[in-house]
């Protein structure tokens, strides 16, 4: 499989800081036993798997608004 880059992921996630949060949350899920959403025949590390999932559009996000007090 081709090398995944941050630019590939930024096509799916507009903000690089949001990308870091999304990838780290997905890595935690994978470490806790979640199944990869893509083929991982090369036994890549969870960080690479999470970035490939984001770049392929398998992992997304939803922004929620906070209520002001």
From Swiss-Prot:
Protein name, as recorded: DNA-directed RNA polymerase subunit omega
Return the similarity comment. Belongs to the RNA polymerase subunit omega family.
Q: What is said about its interaction partners and assembly? A: The RNAP catalytic core consists of 2 alpha, 1 beta, 1 beta' and 1 omega subunit. When a sigma factor is associated with the core the holoenzyme is formed, which can initiate transcription.
Asked if the Swiss-Prot or TrEMBL record annotates the protein with the keyword GTP-binding, the reply is no
Q: Name one Pfam family in it.
A: RNA_pol_Rpb6
> Which HAMAP family does the UniProt record give?
RNApol_bact_RpoZ
Q: Name one GO cellular component term.
A: DNA-directed RNA polymerase complex
């Amino acid at each position: 499989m081709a090398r995944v880059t941050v630019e590939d992921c930024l096509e799916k996630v507009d903000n690089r800081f949001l990308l870091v949060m999304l990838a780290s949350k997905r890595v935690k899920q994978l470490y806790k036993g979640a199944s990869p959403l893509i083929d991982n025949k090369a036994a890549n590390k969870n960080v690479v798997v999470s970035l490939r999932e984001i770049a392929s559009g398998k992992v997304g996000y939803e922004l929620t608004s906070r209520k002001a007090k």
